[in-house]
């Protein structure tokens, strides 16, 4: 006998999932950031508005000095907007918070602590309501996810660049932030290590992609396309603004070997090249 309620239940569940995925994770509203210096006031970014949906991966791309990191720092809470506001998960950002994990290019690991303790310190400072056993389990789980459990007792100075960045990513994920901010995290890595880190990042995101929003700063067009749902192209500073937002309509999961032959990938790649480098073209 067919249960007539099942289609209704499935439809309701699908509606709930779609609604959840459409929720806004980050809202940047008319944000301007200016700094006072010896030569007067320097406006890094001006009148920027952007919404990032829950579960999205969005990259910020542009030339050096276009305000990418400044915009990222307003989301992290380390830079306060001169005008406008940034909202994360429905709350106006007043400063850094555990709902936003950050990974920098320079790893930012404590050199005197082991891999394990670097992650444990972060978990211990955020997860006040957890027991010591629960915290240890969280650290171990995240080390396993980035394949670093055998290296848990090593100091950062004993690790390669790629391994250090995996520690930094594991530390960020261990505190279970709903928003992960990546400021050129793979910029100093060689091409092979960078490629493997992309896969590691997407695996971690995929475990909780309905709840994990990622915003990343990069100079790498290929990286932006491979990882992103949308690419935000910034104009040059000062007074940098958003030049254009490019949708990346490529199915997931993505394979680096196959994706570059996809006509849509080629179209997006050419579009980003045009937006970023047209002014440097040489005419005959």
What is the role of each PLM region?
Residues 61-63:
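The feature captures the beta-strand-to-loop junction immediately N-terminal to the Walker
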Residues 76:
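Helix-to-loop junction immediately C-terminal to a conserved catalytic motif
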Residues 84-96:
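Conserved ABC transporter NBD signature motif
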Residues 113-122:
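Short coil-to-helix segment of the ABC ATPase nucleotide-binding domain corresponding to the Q-loop/switch region
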Residues 131-151, 202-203:
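Conserved ABC ATPase "signature" region
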Residues 154, 175:
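Conserved signature/switch motifs of ABC ATPase nucleotide-binding domains
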Residues 155-159, 163:
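Conserved ABC ATPase signature
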């Amino acid at each position: 006998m067919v249960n007539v309620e099942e289609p209704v239940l499935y439809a309701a569940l699908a509606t709930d999932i779609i609604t959840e995925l459409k929720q806004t994770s980050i809202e940047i509203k008319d944000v301007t950031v200016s700094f006072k210096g010896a030569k007067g006031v320097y406006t890094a970014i001006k009148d920027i508005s952007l919404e990032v949906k829950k579960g999205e991966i969005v990259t910020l791309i542009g030339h050096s000095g276009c305000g990418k990191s400044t915009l990222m720092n307003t989301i992290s809470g380390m830079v306060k907007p001169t005008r406008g506001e940034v909202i994360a998960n429905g709350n106006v950002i007043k400063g850094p918070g555990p709902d936003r994990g950050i990974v920098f290019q320079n790893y930012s690991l404590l050199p005197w602590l082991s891999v394990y303790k670097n992650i444990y310190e972060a978990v211990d400072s955020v997860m006040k309501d957890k027991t010591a056993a629960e915290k240890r389990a969280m650290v171990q789980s995240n080390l396993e996810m980035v394949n670093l459990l055998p290296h848990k007792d090593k100091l950062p100075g004993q690790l390669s660049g790629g391994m250090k960045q995996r520690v930094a990513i594991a530390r960020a994920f261990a505190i279970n932030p709903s928003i992960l901010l990546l400021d050129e995290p793979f910029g100093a890595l060689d091409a092979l290590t960078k490629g493997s880190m992309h896969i590691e990042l997407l695996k971690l995101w995929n475990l909780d992609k309905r709840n994990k929003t990622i915003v990343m700063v990069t100079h790498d067009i290929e990286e932006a396309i491979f990882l992103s749902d949308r690419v935000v192209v910034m104009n040059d500073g000062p007074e940098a603004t958003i030049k254009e937002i490019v949708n990346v309509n490529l199915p997931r999961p993505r394979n680096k070997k196959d994706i570059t032959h996809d006509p849509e990938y080629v179209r997006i790649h050419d579009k980003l090249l045009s937006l970023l480098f047209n002014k440097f073209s040489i005419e005959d």
